[in-house]
Amino acid sequence: MSIFPTKILLATDGSREAELAGQTAADIAQKTDSELHVVHVLASPLATHDPSSFEPEVWARLEQRERTTLEDVVGKIEASGGAVEGSHHTAGRPDAEIVVLAEEIGAGLIVMGARGMGRIRRALTGSVSDSVVRHAHCPVLVVRE
């Protein structure tokens, strides 16, 4: 039995920190022969609104922009020689959606970036990475710049 995960979930928002996490996840997946899955979540509060409350063109542009972010991340990983087994786009609270998807696909590791929020802001609002670390069923690797 290997101590390495068979499935890795990379959570991305397209940020610089997430790009570094993507490079890390791709390296780990390649070196451990693990499947790599990538998720991008259309974050609240937009995701909690009924899409019909937006002009159809506005909602379509939002969704397309978010899908493009996911496609760009997958493209960069594949261009650097990595392989992506699955790409997932969803909407909702990013922390909750990441944890749920990790469980659904049986991920053995979640990899994500962390933004450098100050202590006061983090105390007031929390962070996606903090919440995922607390609630995930598997180890979480938080990559910092």
Protein language model regions, located:
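Short secondary-structure boundary segments
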Residues: H40, G113-R115, R144-E145
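Solvent-exposed polar/charged
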Residues: Q30, E103-E104, R134
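Structural beta-alpha unit
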Residues: M1-F4, G75-I110
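Small/aliphatic-rich secondary-structure junction motif
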Residues: S2-S53, G86
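Short, hinge-like loop/turn segments at secondary-structure boundaries
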Residues: S53-E57, E103-I105, V128-S129
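A short acidic, glycine-rich active-site loop
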Residues: E55-T68
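Glycine-rich, Arg-bearing micro-motifs that act as flexible, cationic patches
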Residues: L109-S131
